[in-house]
């Protein structure tokens, strides 16, 4: 059944210039522009929103858990450009054509809500956070002062307070921002400001060579942040990891001492709780001991692994996180709050964030307002306009409760454990290692390679398998799964369970489909 208006009649939204002109005689013109009444057809606009919402409901929401739908309908870029009609013209298009464009966008977009989308560290559909997104898009708020965003500022404060509690701090501060990469940049800049407050006004001149330490398995945003902030990528010291991808504390101690002997100024250690590929958790207590001994700021990038704090069973993975000075935590990942929903949390409660980032814009942050201006939190952010991302997490948390969020984490990790055991049973599948979290890394070895000795030729051929299977699954639309080479290991698959819509049957299908797509290689 078509969701588009009947094209035989005059479609909604097709407004003639005559219809736009007010019927009254006393038309007011300024620079040739009619100022009487609104310049848009409100009724037609409302009808377009109604039709578009129905399209979203029927084509996205209702099909989100349908395994008979394709995960993606792959088209190469040049073909997709033609199908979407991307050209922007002088004249606008009628609403029936815009709805067709919307339908095309849905059709050719990757269905990240699909139960068989395993490509990234986000997936699935949380209905409550989706409603929250609809609301905030319609209200179009910007979160910087209480006067323009009273509800969302209070919501953000409540969510941050609860997240701080789960980290184990008695009090703290924080801000929601556009991504874990930005959180890591916040941490790097804040640690530098704490080390040398004068840098805010005087800049980098006169400072010693600043150096920071992070895991060799850290997120690539650490290099980007160092470049962006003028610290320099050469001053990011990547500390060796063990075979499971965890930072080795003894190596960290050694590198800090070496840097000091060279005359550099160590100021920050970034540990990782849940690395992107292997899902490794650095030993936080041992790292915190080193930071305390040398007076270094400890930041924990828990963008991926922070959600384990919600689980009484799995929070042990982040043992020692309460000793961190700052934490990055992304509820849009395993807690499914919708991209993007990312918190930067700070143990300090002395307004360090505000002192570091404030610019005291007089048109926003007047101190003689008629209400308590401590609720005007926008000067803690590097942004001015800022989305109310905390609301998505808040509404989902209100709906599910802490116990519901805990169950979400526990179920995801239980399904991951099921997949691990199935991989061990199946011929042609080989685990990289026993997983610590939800990242299941494995090779698929096609029949043609199963009798080969594991020498250079074997690994060279196996390196080609995962990309070829990925191409086949994308073009078929049956599945999406990530792969990568890593630390000297040839291409392997990384599977991550997040969505509660995923079932045991989907785990079985994953392995069956990989075998089906790759057995002739």
UniProtKB/Swiss-Prot annotation:
Q: What does this protein do?
A: Catalyzes the decarboxylation of L-aspartate, 3-sulfino-L-alanine (cysteine sulfinic acid), and L-cysteate to beta-alanine, hypotaurine and taurine, respectively. The preferred substrate is L-aspartate. Does not exhibit any decarboxylation activity toward glutamate.
| Residue segments, region Disordered | 1-20
Q: Where expressed (tissues)?
A: Expressed at highest levels in skeletal muscles. Also detected heart, spleen and rumen.
According to its UniProt record, this protein's enzyme class is lyase
Q: Does the keyword Lyase apply?
A: yes
**Which Pfam families has this protein been placed in?**
Pyridoxal_deC (PF00282)
Family as reported in the entry's similarity comment: Belongs to the group II decarboxylase family.
The organism's superkingdom is given as: Eukaryota
Matching Gene3D superfamilies:
3.90.1150.170, Type I PLP-dependent aspartate aminotransferase-like (Major domain) (3.40.640.10)
InterPro entries, alphabetized: PyrdxlP-dep_de-COase, PyrdxlP-dep_Trfase, PyrdxlP-dep_Trfase_major, Pyridoxal-P_BS
Q: Which GO terms describe its molecular function?
A: aspartate 1-decarboxylase activity; carboxy-lyase activity; pyridoxal phosphate binding; sulfinoalanine decarboxylase activity
GO cellular component terms, semicolon-separated: cytoplasm
| Residues bearing PTM N6-(pyridoxal phosphate)lysine | 333
User: What is the protein's given name?
Assistant: Acidic amino acid decarboxylase GADL1
Quaternary assembly: Homodimer.
**Which segments show compositional bias classed as Basic and acidic residues?**
1-12
Q: Name one GO biological process term.
A: carboxylic acid metabolic process
Q: Which keywords does UniProt give here?
A: Decarboxylase, Lyase, Pyridoxal phosphate
Q: Which cofactor does it need?
A: pyridoxal 5'-phosphate
Q: Which SUPFAM superfamilies match?
A: PLP-dependent transferases (SSF53383)
Its encoding gene is what? GADL1
Query: EC no.?
Result: 4.1.1.11, 4.1.1.29
**Reactions it catalyzes:** L-aspartate + H(+) = beta-alanine + CO2; 3-sulfino-L-alanine + H(+) = hypotaurine + CO2; L-cysteate + H(+) = taurine + CO2
């Amino acid at each position: 059944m078509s969701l588009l208006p009947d094209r035989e009649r005059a479609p909604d939204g097709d407004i003639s210039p005559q219809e736009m002109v007010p019927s009254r005689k006393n038309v007011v013109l300024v620079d040739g522009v009619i100022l009487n009444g609104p310049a848009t057809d409100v009724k037609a606009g409302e009808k377009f929103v109604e039709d578009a919402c129905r399209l979203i409901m029927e084509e996205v929401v209702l099909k989100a858990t349908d395994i008979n739908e394709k995960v993606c309908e792959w088209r190469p870029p040049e073909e997709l450009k033609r199908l979407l009609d991307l050209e922007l013209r002088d004249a606008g298009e009628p609403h029936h054509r815009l709805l067709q464009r919307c339908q095309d966008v849905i059709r050719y977009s990757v269905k990240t809500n699909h139960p068989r989308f395993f490509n990234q560290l986000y997936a699935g559909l949380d209905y409550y956070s989706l409603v929250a997104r609809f609301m905030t898009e319609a209200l179009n708020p910007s979160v910087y002062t209480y006067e323009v965003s009273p509800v969302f500022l209070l919501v953000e404060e409540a969510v941050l307070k609860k997240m701080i509690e789960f980290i184990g701090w008695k009090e703290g501060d924080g801000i929601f921002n556009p991504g874990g990469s930005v959180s890591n940049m916040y941490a790097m800049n804040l640690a530098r400001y704490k080390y040398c407050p004068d840098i805010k006004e005087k800049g980098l001149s006169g400072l010693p060579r600043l150096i920071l330490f992070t895991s060799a398995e850290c997120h690539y945003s650490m290099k980007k942040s160092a470049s962006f902030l003028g610290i320099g990528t050469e001053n990011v010291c990547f500390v060796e990891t063990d075979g499971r991808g965890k930072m080795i504390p003894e190596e960290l101690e050694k590198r800090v001492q070496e840097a000091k002997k060279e005359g550099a100024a160590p100021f920050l250690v970034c540990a990782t709780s849940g690395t992107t590929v292997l899902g490794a958790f650095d030993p936080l207590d041992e790292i915190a001991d080193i930071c305390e001994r040398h007076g270094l700021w400890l930041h924990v990038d828990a963008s991926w692994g922070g959600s384990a704090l919600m689980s009484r069973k799995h929070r042990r993975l982040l043992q020692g996180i309460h000793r961190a000075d700052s934490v990055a935590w992304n509820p849009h990942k395993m807690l499914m709050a919708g991209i993007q929903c990312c918190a930067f949390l700070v143990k300090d409660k002395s307004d360090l964030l505000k002192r570091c980032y404030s610019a005291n814009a007089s048109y926003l942050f007047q101190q003689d307002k008629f209400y308590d201006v401590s609720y005007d939190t926008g000067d803690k952010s590097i942004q001015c306009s800022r989305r109310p991302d905390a609301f998505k997490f808040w509404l989902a948390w209100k709906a599910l409760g802490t116990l519901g969020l805990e169950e979400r984490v526990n179920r995801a990790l239980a399904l991951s454990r099921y997949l691990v055991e199935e991989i061990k049973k199946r011929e042609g599948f080989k685990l990289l290692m026993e997983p610590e979290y939800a990242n299941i890394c494995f090779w698929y070895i096609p029949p043609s390679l199963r009798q080969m000795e594991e020498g250079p030729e074997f690994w060279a051929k196996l390196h080609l398998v995962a990309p070829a299977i990925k191409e086949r699954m994308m073009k078929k639309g049956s599945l999406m799964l990530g792969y990568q080479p890593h630390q000297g290991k040839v291409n392997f698959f990384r599977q991550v369970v997040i969505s509660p819509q995923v079932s045991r049957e989907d785990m079985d299908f994953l392995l069956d489909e990989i075998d089906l797509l790759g057995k002739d290689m």
